[in-house]
Design a protein with these regions (language model features):
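Extracytoplasmic copper-binding redox domains, predominantly the cupredoxin/blue-copper superfamily
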Residues: 24-274
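Hydrophobic alpha-helical targeting segments used for export or membrane insertion
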Residues: 14-16
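Bacterial N-terminal signal peptides that target proteins for export
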Residues: 2-11
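C-terminal motif of bacterial Sec signal peptides marking the signal peptidase cleavage site
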Residues: 18-21
């Protein structure tokens, strides 16, 4: 393990211990409402993420089936056009980089999940995830996790950030995280308490935003840089496989039949919200 990796791990562990020791959250760190100025700045950059409120991840009171038997899988490639995002401007570009929007588009991911499964394979044992700010961008810009996941949120920029995490649709504030220096980390168990889409914004850099999809079952994936996804250990049957990406008005359902020992394929391309 390198020195930088060790430092990052130690910081994450300290943040987790601090979060566990706190019975409440400081108003200066969490629970605050974004200022009117922050809302106006975001509106000026014309980021329309209202469609995220239309995404239903399908709570089904999932339970593990210890006698699952033979299963199948679904895989494929999703290459949908991501929307343009506003670039940074002025002095911010000297700190954040000159092309944050292009980087965000290149790394855009699509959510893929199966609906209608109330039982199946076990949930992930490891319920810890990382989120970071790099060049004033959220990485990964789209992430998926299960209910109960603890997030370690890092600031890798030498500039101030104030991340606001809200629930899509209701816009209820889940957490507010101010960052004052590079290397700072905050651990939070608030972001994945229940299923749904969580929106991420920075009040200081309105083009900085991302999404966390929180599921109460394990049958989901996020496409990688090449657009590929894979969901395994699926009980045999016919399912609706949902696909959603920023820019789509609502998730697209795709009917897929999965046989025991087989692998179904789902490939999509074209414009988002076709």
């Amino acid at each position: 393990m390198t020195a930088s990796a060790s430092t990052r791990l130690i910081a994450a562990l300290l943040a987790t211990l601090l979060a566990a020791a706190c019975s409440g959250d400081s108003p200066s760190a969490r629970g605050a409402t974004p200022s009117a100025g922050a809302v106006n700045r975001a509106a000026a950059h014309k980021i329309d993420d209202s469609a995220a409120g239309n995404v239903d991840l399908g709570s089904a009171k999932y339970h593990v089936n210890p006698s699952l038997g033979a299963t199948g899988s679904v895989h494929g490639t999703i290459k949908l056009e991501a929307p343009s995002r506003a670039d940074s401007n002025g002095s911010a570009s000297r700190i954040c980089g000159s092309k944050p929007a292009a980087a965000a588009r290149d790394k855009a991911g699509a959510l893929v999940w199966i609906v209608g499964l109330s039982s199946g394979k076990p949930l992930p044992i490891e319920k810890r995830a990382e989120l970071s700010s790099e060049d004033c961008l959220v990485f990964p810009p789209v992430q998926a996790a299960v209910v109960g996941t603890t997030f370690n949120v890092f600031n890798d920029d030498k500039t101030l950030h104030k991340f606001v995490f809200t629930r899509a649709g209701t816009h209820d504030t889940l957490a507010v995280m101010p960052f004052f220096n590079a290397g700072q980390v905050v651990a939070s168990e608030r972001l994945a308490k229940s299923s749904g889409i969580v929106e991420i914004r920075c009040t200081r850099h309105p083009w900085t935003h991302g999404y966390i999809a929180v599921f109460d079952h394990p049958y989901f994936d996020v496409t990688d840089a090449s657009g590929k996804f894979s969901i395994d250990s699926v009980p045999p049957g016919t399912y609706s496989v949902m696909v959603w990406q920023e820019g789509m008005d609502k998730p697209e359902p795709h009917r897929v039949q999965i046989a025991a020992g087989g692998s179904a394929t789902l490939d999509l391309s074209g414009g988002a919200g076709r």
